[in-house]
Each structure stands twice: as structure tokens, then as C-alpha cells.
Amino acid sequence: MYFCVFLEEKMSKKHDDSYSHVLKYTSLFGGVQVLSIMIGLVRNKAMALFLGAAGMGFNALLISMQNFASQCTNLGISFGAVPRLSELHEHQDDEKLHYYVQVVRLWSMIAAVLGLLFCVIVSPLMNQLSFTWGDHTLHYAMLALAVAMIAITGGETAIMKATRQLGRLAIAQIFTVIVSLIVSVPLYYYYSHSGVVPAIVLIAFATMLITLFYSYRTFPFRFDFHRSMLRDGASMIRLGVAFVLAAAIGSASEVAIRAYLNVVGSMDDVGLYNAAFMITITYAGLVFSAMETDYFPRLSGVANDYEATNSIVNKQIEVSLLLLAPMLVALMMVLPMLIPILFSNEFLPVVGMAQVAVLAMYFKVLTMPVSYITLARRLSLSFLLLESSYYVILVLAIVCCFQCWGLWGTGLAIVIAHVLENVLVMGYATWKYGYRITSAVLRYAAFQLTIGFGAFAVTMLCEGFLYWITEAALTIVSTAYSIHVLRQKTHLWERLRSKLRI
């Protein structure tokens, strides 16, 4: 509890756009992500013990339905509300800010009602499509409560992100993952399969209460409805819907990829592809998690200032690249040991695919901060077109590369798709927004990419002791370089010495 108070006090201090700020919040939310993953593993273990494979499948089916219903009805408010709120917060226009908070909350309630009605209406159909035994209509209908609460939570989360309540948001996320474990495990233990739906609903309820508690401390609830609120939320909904559509296109592309691998290859290929994809994306997500939470609101606040935008984007790329690059080299090195531990020896054929796919994350970390400029400027159509282009490229690349090189080719296809996305996004941002990449970014990228491709070459050419010693050396070099640069940029060593009284 004292840690949470300390964290809130530290994070409530005046924010800036320095390298230290980027490093602090990337580390903070990366840490929260690690905690979430660890607690998720404990929950999965509890489900495996108390529910068995069938119970885990039942839970996965219901969670999929919940996510589908949320995606169809939440109007993208958790994302679309951030740019306007950030802009008002940046300009310290408190009157308009409080008014727009009410707009967001009104539309969140509308989304909650839509989600509730959607679940209730489609529950008989979903029961017929997904089950051949028993009547689970009530289970699907009960998910309506969870979907409605998730919509309300999304609106409040957007408010906290945009108004830089990042310390409180981090605390809320920590409490949420802990409470989810405390709530779910006893229900699985005492009620087995019958506890699955109550666990989903109670976790959503606890998450909503925790988020509301912290959000209402800054923006207390007020009911002051005006018809203009519906109209003033239109731009938010346009951007939110574009974000939802892009996510839907992404989901459709993943379905198409897995269906293609199953038809042309086998179900084993689908499972192996899924395992490698999950490891790579989840691992890199430790760094990327801070972008939506901290970076996007900061960028939205200065979206119309070209100089400030360039500065924020380039600093985010630098810090994210320097943090992620050593992690990627280390991941490439340990994948032959990690995959059997996380899965089984049956998944060893996917090691090569995962190692080449790791290279894609270098280009993703260069692209992602730039792609947020379109969102920060609320250009919903441009965002949708850029995202759609990437998914089309990804599907086509996987179709071609799988035919030529099998499963390893799908990893290469992911790299090709990210390289082309980088060219497309960088080119568009340069032409449309006057974005200019700095020499520092190019210098750091050149060094870390050289190390990364060198590490990949080692995976192809070396075995045994030579493999491990060379990969370890490259990991040390990449880490030392990142620490050296971050120490210069953030005075990291001086701060550590002052904390440790060295």
C-alpha cells in the first residue's frame, strides 16, 4: 500500500518530454505488463488444475465472445477520446476539459447499453453456433454485464491517460491484475465450470470499480446532459470507429493467415505459427505497452506543433529502440531453450521462424511512434488506409513465403511486411506532416540493426558452444551500447548513485 502511495506521488510530479520521462514511463508500464503476464500464468495454471482442458476451452470461448462483443459495440472510445482530451489538458482549458469528460462518459454509457443489448440479442444464436451440448444461452447473456462494464472502464481509462494520471493508472492496473487472481481462483476451485462466467463478470466489475475510484478523484461524477454532447462526441466516435475497423481488419487477416496455413499446410503449422507469433509479440509488448498509455496522449497534446511533434516522436523512437534492442538479441539467443520450457519439444521446429520474426520488431519499434501521428491528428481515414495496407502486405507475404520456404518463410514474411510498413508510414509522415527523422535515430538504428542481423546470422551459421558464446557477446555489446547512450541522455548513472548513496 505504501508503495502505491509513493508511486502516485512520484508520478504526479510535473511531466516533461525529456528522455528521462520516456524511460521512466516505458519502464513503469513495461513492469506492469510483466506483472500482468506473471499473474496470467498463475491464473492459467489454476484453470488447468481446477477446470481441466475442457474448462479452459469453455473459458476461452466465452472470453472470445466477450472480446468480439466489446469490439463491435465499444465505438473505440478508449482510443478515440484521447486526442481531444489531451489537447484540452495541454492547453489547460479546464472548463472545456470538464465538459468533454462528460461527453466521453455519456458516450461510454451509450456504448455500454449497446454492448449489453448486443450480448442479450445474439446469445441464442451464439449458443447454437458454438455448442452441441447443453443450453448456454444464459452464459452468453450474462456476458452482457461484463461487456457493459468494460465499455465504462474504457472511457475512464481514456480520461486518465489523456490527463496524465499515469501514476494512478499504473496503480489501478496493478490492483486489477491482483484482484483478478484473488477473485477467479476460489471460484474455479469451489465451482469448477460453473464459476467461469461469474469470474469473468466479477473481474470486469472489480476493474470498473478500481478505475472509477481513481478517475473520479480528479473528475468527480456530474450529470449535466445537453444534446450538444452527442454532437460534440462525433469526431471522437469517427476516430474510435476507424480504430475498431482497423482492429477488425487485423483480426480478419489473422483468421485468413491461419486458415491458409491449415489448408496448404496442416493444423500443426497453425499451432507452431501461433506459438512463435505469440512469443515475439508478447515479449516486444513489454516496451510497446507504454506507447498507448503515455506517448500517445503526449503526442496528441502537441499534434499541431510540427517541431514539438518531431521532438517527441524521435525521443520515443530512441528510448524504445535502445531498451528493446538488447532484449531482442537476448530473445533470439534463448529461443532454443525457451520454447521447450513454455510449450514442449514438439514446438522446436518453430525456433527458426521465431528467430527471424524477431527482426521484424526492430522495424516495428521504428514505425510505431511515427504511425501515432496520424491518430494524434485525428485523421481516421488515413489511419485506416495505412493499417489496412499493412495487413494486405502481411497476408500476401505469408502466402508467397510459406509456399517457398515453409514455416520459416512465415517469419521472413513478417519481417518483409514490417519493412514495407516502415517505408510506407515514414514516407507518408514525411510528406503529410513534415516529419524528419534525426541523425541520432539513424545512428542508433544502424548500430542496433547491425547487431540484430549479426545475431540472426549466428543462429544460421553456428552451433553448440560457438553459438552461445557469440550470441552472449552480441547481447552484451548491444546492452552496453544502450546503457552508454541512455546514461548520457538521462543522467541515469548519477540518479542511481544518488539513490544508492554511492
Where are these predicted regions, by residue range?
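Membrane-proximal transmembrane or re-entrant/amphipathic helices at the cytosolic face
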Residues: 1-16, 456-502
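Alpha-helical transmembrane segments of multi-pass membrane transport and lipid-handling proteins
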Residues: 2, 6, 102-131, 142, ...
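Interhelical loop/hinge segments that connect adjacent transmembrane helices in multipass membrane
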Residues: 3-22, 211-254, 294-311, 432-446, ...
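Membrane-water interface segments that mark the loop-to-transmembrane alpha-helix transition
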Residues: 23-36, 62, 71-124, 138-139, ...
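Transmembrane helical elements of multi-pass membrane transporters/channels
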Residues: 25-44, 56, 176, 200-207, ...
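Helix-loop junctions and terminal segments of transmembrane helices
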Residues: 75-91, 162, 219-220, 276, ...
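Hydrophobic alpha-helical transmembrane segments
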Residues: 137, 141, 170-218, 235-239, ...
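Membrane-interface junctions at transmembrane-helix termini in multi-pass inner-membrane proteins
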Residues: 148-172, 358-389, 429-431
